[in-house]
């Protein structure tokens, strides 16, 4: 494979944050002897992509296969994209600084809708034809995955295949098919046909998209163009999640990234059923890692990475049946080491005095709660089964235990929303701040901090609200932003 480093290195002195483009980070795996090379791409800058837990997991599982190498690539900052084009340098991988177009397969994660144009920029910068039907035998297979792959049709013209669902088992299995057939000299079309037979894999070129009326009558939005293809694509599920280690050797970046800490996934799935939440629908059923697994992963991960903060990640971490035991044991193991424990997804109705003390650990950071809506009526509509009393009780417990910073997350534009619901956000936030203040000793109130975030509701595929579209041409009421 072509090594672009001699051409890239002279450009780094003028680049913003040049460490974004350096290889050989601590924990980086490079397998030059592999006979099949796969590049995992996050369509945004290194700081965002390297913090992505899915990318870390999938690079590890592919690299664990003998003869397969997984490398990483990220979309450079806009100024660097311009520089690469001016110098005629295509997008490259981090590990070997090789052009993406020279890999056997390129996987692009689809984290959110606003990354769609970044996907096209990634392909263009890599010199890979944008449209799947324009690619030839020498081009890599371009596969998509991630949250937006659950609604693949908007992206279908640009991808050869999609991995729908969790990728720990599906991705290596699909790549093994590609590897075997490429070694046999199979044509691109034959490889895609074989991939379509694998559970959880969708090949758009082998299906026809049905119009709405036709789809309702047939019971499916897609029609196979060949016999033997599944009418519905079922998501892949990693059934071995509970037994798998919560931490595996990971890359410690040279430069600061978002969520720059040790991340240990303790729980996958959510049983709460909020009607707007795609992740809660996608990652069912709920699966837990044991307390022993989690604690061992935290202790080992902190020792091997040097981080002083650990995040126990999931969609709803305080719903773990052993969360109290986990936090108690981690606090004991990290006593005196200055380690901060972060539990980013905290349910208001399961956060009390005991939980506040356990989460505090050696350092007290910030707490994040998500009432989502400003009134109880709207919370009931979206099936967010928490009350104002739950919020106030959680704040009382946390701030009496010594916390001084809090974030509240809301959404605007939800179905059935009225102006009263919008005003309710401001009212609830003010009353929440008053409770924080009342629970804090007067001499410490100057350090109180509350931030309120309001995200715009976006209908997500595979959720009860997926068809709750906003018709811009027919506004029902004004949206005031100040």
Residue spans of the language-model regions?
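Core structural elements
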Residues: 146, 269, 448-458
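Structured alpha-helical segments in the cores of large, soluble enzyme domains
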Residues: 26, 142-145, 149-152, 171, ...
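Short secondary-structure boundary/capping segments
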Residues: 55, 87, 123, 157-162, ...
